[in-house]
C-alpha cells in the first residue's frame, strides 16, 4: 500500500471540512455531495499543477461548492449573525490562502472556520 501523499491528505481534509459544514446546514444530500466530489477532482488537477497551493485547497473547495449551490439552489451558507434584513450568504476568506474561514461582510465578523459552521449555527458540530 502506498503512503498517503500530502496532496491526498489535503484533498481528504478539504472534503471532510466542507461536508461537515453541509451537514451542519442540513444540505448534505446526495446531489450536493456530488458537487463536493466534482470540486475535489478539479482541485486535485489544480494542485498537481501548482503544488504550493496545497494549503489553499479547503477554502477553494468551499468556494467551489458555494458557487455551485448558488447556481442550482440558492445562497449557502446563510449568515447566522444577521437575523433581520435580506438573507445573505457568508463568504470564504482568504479567497486564496491557508486557514479559510466563513465571514459575514455585512457585519464585518468572522463566523467560523471552514468545517466548523455547526458550532456557529447551532447545527451539528464537526468532530
How should these model regions be labeled?
Residues 1-55:
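N-terminal alpha-helical interaction blocks
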Residues 51-127:
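Cys/His-clustered metal-coordination modules, chiefly Zn-binding fingers
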